[in-house]
Amino acid sequence: LDCTPSLGMLTINALAAAAVGLLLGETPELIAQGLVSYQASGMRQNIYEQDGYQIYADCYNASPDAMEATLSVLGGMAGDGRRFAVLGSMLELGDYAEEGHRRAGRAAAQYADALYAYGPDAAAMVAGAREKGMEHAYAFDDQTALVAALREDAKKGDALLFKGSRGMRMERALAMFLGEEVEA
Protein backbone atom coordinates (compact mmCIF):
# COMPACT_ATOMS: atom_id res chain seq x y z
CA LEU A 1 0.00 0.00 0.00
CA ASP A 2 1.71 3.17 -1.19
CA CYS A 3 0.42 6.28 0.58
CA THR A 4 3.40 8.45 -0.37
CA PRO A 5 1.28 11.55 -1.16
CA SER A 6 0.49 11.89 2.54
CA LEU A 7 3.51 11.33 4.75
CA GLY A 8 4.48 11.45 8.39
CA MET A 9 2.33 12.48 11.31
CA LEU A 10 -0.24 13.88 8.90
CA THR A 11 -1.51 10.33 8.26
CA ILE A 12 -2.80 9.89 11.81
CA ASN A 13 -6.26 11.23 10.91
CA ALA A 14 -6.44 8.79 8.00
CA LEU A 15 -5.57 5.91 10.32
CA ALA A 16 -8.27 7.00 12.77
CA ALA A 17 -10.80 7.16 9.93
CA ALA A 18 -9.74 3.69 8.78
CA ALA A 19 -10.25 2.34 12.30
CA VAL A 20 -13.74 3.87 12.46
CA GLY A 21 -14.52 2.36 9.06
CA LEU A 22 -13.51 -1.08 10.31
CA LEU A 23 -15.66 -0.63 13.43
CA LEU A 24 -18.62 0.30 11.22
CA GLY A 25 -18.16 -2.85 9.14
CA GLU A 26 -16.34 -1.57 6.06
CA THR A 27 -13.97 -4.04 4.43
CA PRO A 28 -10.21 -3.54 4.68
CA GLU A 29 -10.08 -3.59 0.87
CA LEU A 30 -12.52 -0.68 0.56
CA ILE A 31 -10.64 1.30 3.19
CA ALA A 32 -7.30 0.61 1.46
CA GLN A 33 -8.81 1.72 -1.85
CA GLY A 34 -9.89 5.00 -0.26
CA LEU A 35 -6.45 5.60 1.23
CA VAL A 36 -4.63 4.86 -2.01
CA SER A 37 -6.93 7.15 -4.02
CA TYR A 38 -6.29 10.12 -1.72
CA GLN A 39 -5.45 13.31 -3.62
CA ALA A 40 -4.25 16.51 -2.00
CA SER A 41 -6.57 19.43 -2.60
CA GLY A 42 -5.84 23.05 -3.29
CA MET A 43 -2.68 24.30 -1.63
CA ARG A 44 -2.41 21.54 0.98
CA GLN A 45 -0.04 18.55 1.12
CA ASN A 46 1.16 18.76 -2.48
CA ILE A 47 4.29 16.66 -2.84
CA TYR A 48 5.85 16.38 -6.27
CA GLU A 49 9.10 16.60 -8.20
CA GLN A 50 9.82 19.48 -10.57
CA ASP A 51 13.00 20.66 -12.25
CA GLY A 52 15.02 18.16 -10.22
CA TYR A 53 13.71 19.37 -6.84
CA GLN A 54 11.43 17.54 -4.44
CA ILE A 55 8.71 20.06 -3.63
CA TYR A 56 6.35 19.95 -0.67
CA ALA A 57 3.86 22.81 -1.06
CA ASP A 58 1.47 23.31 1.84
CA CYS A 59 0.71 27.00 1.47
CA TYR A 60 -2.92 27.31 2.52
CA ASN A 61 -2.55 27.96 6.23
CA ALA A 62 -0.20 27.50 9.16
CA SER A 63 -0.11 27.03 12.91
CA PRO A 64 2.72 25.89 15.18
CA ASP A 65 1.35 22.32 15.24
CA ALA A 66 0.92 22.27 11.45
CA MET A 67 4.44 23.64 10.97
CA GLU A 68 5.89 20.85 13.13
CA ALA A 69 3.87 18.20 11.28
CA THR A 70 4.90 19.37 7.82
CA LEU A 71 8.51 19.81 8.91
CA SER A 72 8.52 16.20 10.14
CA VAL A 73 7.38 15.15 6.66
CA LEU A 74 10.20 17.21 5.12
CA GLY A 75 12.63 15.45 7.46
CA GLY A 76 11.47 12.08 6.15
CA MET A 77 11.57 12.91 2.46
CA ALA A 78 13.87 10.61 0.52
CA GLY A 79 16.81 11.81 -1.45
CA ASP A 80 20.48 12.54 -1.22
CA GLY A 81 20.09 16.29 -1.16
CA ARG A 82 19.53 18.80 1.57
CA ARG A 83 16.21 19.80 3.08
CA PHE A 84 15.09 23.44 2.97
CA ALA A 85 12.29 24.83 5.12
CA VAL A 86 10.89 27.92 3.37
CA LEU A 87 8.46 29.21 5.98
CA GLY A 88 6.22 32.25 6.06
CA SER A 89 5.01 33.84 9.26
CA MET A 90 1.98 32.37 11.02
CA LEU A 91 -0.48 35.22 11.27
CA GLU A 92 -3.14 35.60 13.96
CA LEU A 93 -1.17 34.00 16.82
CA GLY A 94 -1.65 37.07 19.01
CA ASP A 95 0.33 36.97 22.25
CA TYR A 96 1.73 33.56 21.27
CA ALA A 97 3.39 34.89 18.10
CA GLU A 98 6.96 35.11 19.45
CA GLU A 99 6.95 31.67 21.08
CA GLY A 100 4.99 30.05 18.24
CA HIS A 101 7.54 31.22 15.69
CA ARG A 102 10.48 30.21 17.88
CA ARG A 103 8.87 26.78 18.19
CA ALA A 104 8.62 26.54 14.40
CA GLY A 105 12.28 27.52 14.13
CA ARG A 106 13.29 24.82 16.63
CA ALA A 107 11.33 22.27 14.59
CA ALA A 108 13.05 23.47 11.42
CA ALA A 109 16.41 22.88 13.09
CA GLN A 110 15.32 19.33 13.91
CA TYR A 111 14.06 18.39 10.44
CA ALA A 112 15.74 20.68 7.88
CA ASP A 113 19.26 21.61 6.85
CA ALA A 114 18.40 25.26 6.19
CA LEU A 115 15.63 27.69 7.11
CA TYR A 116 14.50 30.56 4.90
CA ALA A 117 11.95 32.49 6.97
CA TYR A 118 9.76 35.23 5.54
CA GLY A 119 7.50 37.81 7.09
CA PRO A 120 7.05 39.91 10.21
CA ASP A 121 8.00 37.03 12.53
CA ALA A 122 10.88 35.63 10.48
CA ALA A 123 13.47 36.76 13.04
CA ALA A 124 11.74 34.78 15.79
CA MET A 125 11.81 31.63 13.61
CA VAL A 126 15.51 32.14 12.95
CA ALA A 127 16.14 32.69 16.67
CA GLY A 128 14.39 29.40 17.47
CA ALA A 129 16.43 27.56 14.85
CA ARG A 130 19.68 29.00 16.16
CA GLU A 131 18.71 27.99 19.72
CA LYS A 132 18.91 24.41 18.43
CA GLY A 133 22.22 24.92 16.64
CA MET A 134 21.08 25.55 13.07
CA GLU A 135 23.67 27.68 11.29
CA HIS A 136 21.86 28.09 7.97
CA ALA A 137 18.84 30.11 9.11
CA TYR A 138 17.93 33.35 7.37
CA ALA A 139 15.19 35.96 7.79
CA PHE A 140 13.68 37.92 4.90
CA ASP A 141 11.09 40.66 4.70
CA ASP A 142 10.90 40.42 0.90
CA GLN A 143 9.98 37.32 -1.11
CA THR A 144 12.10 38.34 -4.08
CA ALA A 145 15.21 38.49 -1.88
CA LEU A 146 14.30 35.16 -0.28
CA VAL A 147 13.92 33.48 -3.67
CA ALA A 148 17.20 34.94 -4.95
CA ALA A 149 19.07 33.57 -1.92
CA LEU A 150 17.29 30.21 -2.16
CA ARG A 151 18.21 29.86 -5.84
CA GLU A 152 21.86 30.40 -4.91
CA ASP A 153 21.80 27.69 -2.24
CA ALA A 154 19.38 24.98 -3.41
CA LYS A 155 20.62 22.37 -5.88
CA LYS A 156 18.96 19.64 -7.92
CA GLY A 157 18.05 16.72 -5.66
CA ASP A 158 17.21 18.96 -2.69
CA ALA A 159 13.81 18.86 -0.96
CA LEU A 160 12.00 22.14 -0.32
CA LEU A 161 8.99 22.76 1.92
CA PHE A 162 6.97 25.94 1.31
CA LYS A 163 4.53 26.72 4.14
CA GLY A 164 3.01 29.75 5.82
CA SER A 165 -0.22 31.51 6.67
CA ARG A 166 -2.53 32.23 3.75
CA GLY A 167 -1.69 35.93 3.97
CA MET A 168 2.01 35.22 3.39
CA ARG A 169 1.30 33.81 -0.10
CA MET A 170 4.08 31.24 0.00
CA GLU A 171 2.81 29.72 -3.25
CA ARG A 172 4.06 32.94 -4.85
CA ALA A 173 7.58 32.32 -3.50
CA LEU A 174 7.42 28.76 -4.83
CA ALA A 175 6.30 29.95 -8.27
CA MET A 176 9.12 32.52 -8.38
CA PHE A 177 11.63 29.86 -7.32
CA LEU A 178 10.46 27.59 -10.14
CA GLY A 179 10.68 30.46 -12.64
CA GLU A 180 6.94 30.73 -13.18
CA GLU A 181 5.17 34.03 -13.73
CA VAL A 182 3.58 35.56 -10.65
CA GLU A 183 1.22 38.44 -10.03
CA ALA A 184 2.76 41.53 -8.48
Where are these predicted regions, by residue range?
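ATP-dependent carboxylate-amine ligase
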Residues: 6-9, 16-184
